[in-house]
A protein has these predicted regions:
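Metallocofactor- and cofactor-centric catalytic cores in central/energy metabolism, strongly enriched
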Residues: 1-267
Length: 267
């Protein structure tokens, strides 16, 4: 009875159910960006209020499909505004992303792999590990970090390791060092995962059995346990080689607009 009352199938009408689920998924991403921006000092009362309004609609049986459709579309617009808010937070702290060559190979030193999209956590780890004799690699959503001037200045931000988030089982095994999740996209590890005791989470991310790094009363996060663990690990196993180009943010793209148009006209 409880499942029928609170589960997804509590909504009998298929269209209404689908709209509520679509709205829920949109609000999840929206909330993640708002939380991340707030952590970096940028908030919007208007966007926060919309998040509450949208969530209320997902559980209000009196909201009709026309209203739900409008809310789904509005969530897209508000999501774009949340992205702009987060972009402001990131660029105010770390500068505008610029064209950057990122290594996808590996070095000889042990490493820490950082996933998610919280740039402040990455910066804190880079500062704490700068003289530790280890390298820091980005994974998945953290790849764009290499384009920010305020982060690429750290020489031990070595490169990017791995591909899509769903390849974690294979790539975390071959990385051989600690992994830090700063936001979501955690794939539950298989029972025999050799890397499970090396995974850490922080912020809103978390998973049963993974050690979590909380901030102290001053908001400082101590990543020394990852750094010390990394020192005892082997260097990453190479799965790729070469470089990739990143940094095509809106500011950089606007600077390249004229050369791009000229190249198009020239064929």
């Amino acid at each position: 009875a409880a499942q029928a009352e609170i589960g997804v199938l509590r909504t009998g009408d298929i269209d209404s159910r689908s709209l509520r689920e679509l709205l829920t998924y949109g609000l999840k991403g929206f909330a993640a960006y708002l939380h991340h921006a707030a952590e970096l000092g940028e908030e919007s009362a208007v966007l926060n209020a919309y998040l509450v309004r949208g969530l209320v609609a997902t559980v209000d049986s009196q909201v009709d499909n026309t209203t739900l459709t409008a809310l789904v579309l509005e969530t897209g617009a508000k999501g774009l505004a949340a992205m702009a808010l987060l972009d402001t937070a990131n660029t105010n702290l770390y500068g505008h992303p610029e064209l950057t060559q990122v290594s996808i190979g590996v070095g000889e030193r042990p490493g820490i792999l950082v996933s998610g999209h919280d740039l402040a956590d990455l910066e804190a780890l880079l500062i704490q590990s700068k003289d530790a004799g280890i390298d820091v690699y980005t994974h998945s959503e953290m790849l764009p970090a290499h384009g920010y001037p305020g982060l690429k200045k750290y020489p031990h931000l070595y490169g990017n390791y791995g591909n899509a988030w769903w390849k974690q089982h294979q790539e975390f095994t071959s990385f051989r060092g600690p992994i830090l999740f700063t936001t979501n996209c955690i794939v539950p590890p298989p029972s025999n995962a050799v890397y499970a005791n090396k995974v850490f989470t922080t912020g809103a991310a978390g998973f049963p059995g993974y050690r979590h790094i909380d901030p102290d009363s001053d908001g400082h996060k101590d990543f020394s346990v990852l750094i010390e663990l990394a020192k005892s690990c082997q260097s990453p196993e190479a799965i790729e080689d070469g470089t990739i180009t990143i940094g095509f943010g809106h500011n950089q793209a606007s600077q390249l607009a004229q050369p791009i148009l000229e190249a198009i006209h020239e064929g």
